[in-house]
């Protein structure tokens, strides 16, 4: 009996231990389950912090990129400004007036060898095209001048240059007076003739317009109308000229 009681007590202890172990496992499992959402929340918080850090880093990188682009644009503008032509610094000093270079060039020209046919005109010996062009222009000018002189001679053959005589040592005052009176009379006649001519033209224009409006209004063909108008105007004009000449003779 004593041994059985010992075995039972041992079994009871074992069952108690197993039960306690099972309870501990359950409690630990529940604790793990309760800790998992806490871990998830912690992970989410860490991820949010990482996102904020990444966004802040992206913003800072954008700002840096913008600053770099602005700096590059400024550099490009400076380079463009540098592209403008600047005055080259002269190698000569302030006190050098270029006389040495000029003297060297003149000496080189004077010491150059010229051929016999170039010695007449040594200045343009190296550029003969200009010489030929200038010679052709001179010849053209001379030819034009000669043609104008011949034209003047032909026109001056039929002209009387000494219409009014010039008083000389002899007594020619009466002849000069007669010539001047004749010239004044001829001028008056020419003036009267010009006035009568213009008056006749105006009179024919007025009369033809009246006749056209009265008699030729029925004609619709423009060409026939023009021919009749020209015939009428010619006849009227000649009649008026004849009448003016007859009145002068009377």
From Swiss-Prot:
Localization, UniProt: Nucleus, Nucleolus
Function, in words: Constituent of pre-60S ribosomal particles. Required for large subunit rRNA maturation, in particular processing of the 27S pre-rRNA at the A3 and B1 sites to yield 5.8S and 25S rRNA.
Chain intervals for the UniProt region annotation (Disordered): 1-101
GO biological process, alphabetically ordered: maturation of 5.8S rRNA; maturation of 5.8S rRNA from tricistronic rRNA transcript (SSU-rRNA, 5.8S rRNA, LSU-rRNA); maturation of LSU-rRNA; maturation of LSU-rRNA from tricistronic rRNA transcript (SSU-rRNA, 5.8S rRNA, LSU-rRNA)
Family the UniProt entry places it in: Belongs to the RRP15 family.
InterPro entries reported for this sequence: Rrp15 (IPR012459)
Name used for this protein in its record: Ribosomal RNA-processing protein 15
Ranges of compositional bias, category Acidic residues: 43-53, 67-83
Anything else known: Present with 6200 molecules/cell in log phase SD medium.
Annotated source species: Saccharomyces cerevisiae (strain ATCC 204508 / S288c)
Alphabetized UniProt keyword annotations: Nucleus, Phosphoprotein, Ribosome biogenesis, rRNA processing
